Amino acid sequence: MCIRDSVITTNTYAIVPFHIGEDRYEDQGGALLELAAKLARDAADSVPREVQVAASVPPMFGSYLPEQFEVQGARRMMLQFRRYLAPVADIFVGETLGSVAEATTYLDVFSDCAADLWLSVTLEDRDPVDGAPRLRSGEPLSELLLSIEGMRFDALLFNCSQPEVMNDAVCISRAELEAFTAQHGAARPMIGAYANAFPLMDEEYEASNASVHQLRQDITPEAYLRYAEQWVESGAEIIGGCCGITPGHIELLANSLKKAPVTMPDYA
């Protein structure tokens, strides 16, 4: 498992106009980012062991809505995230990114930051094809892997998708990244997964923050552990939980896997 024992994420996922509105974002966005950074750093420093802070960089135009992505507007907002979160960040993690354009824009904006750089994408899980994972945009994972070859990232993760679709993505990414890094004499980026416990979203659910979602009752801590063990067997070094994965799930992961996983809750 990963060398890091504990990671918390900043509570910054919702500090974008999609969630808080354009006016509030313009008036208070910077102050909210600064406050979230302070709270996360204070929490990490309050315990007698090393806890790293991962600065959460969300989709700039809403979760599961890659068609709304616009490069220049995204860059402007991402630069604000970088400005306010860099002082506390051990890691930057772009989370729930749903298209090649979202992913490559994020990597470009944060390419020269001092913190580790993690890229986490969300996978299409409504109509998956075995052995051919796709991003929420419908673009093949293979296209993303080709597009980010040569770009800087320290970990590639998959999040906020059903656990059933994660293993194919882990397997394919491991093979492709190992082939590329071996050819260039570089170390392979880490690979990880942190799934959600949502039921399948239909097309009407695409405004994923318009309501409170029900959770799957079958994703118990024990069931989630079985998925996680499969991901580890396939080469994942970072394991955590996204929406609907509780502290109880994470506790069982930490106690059951050989080393404590990196845990990725959606809040600090």
Describe the predicted segments one by one.
Residues 4-268:
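Domain-level signal for soluble alpha/beta catalytic cores
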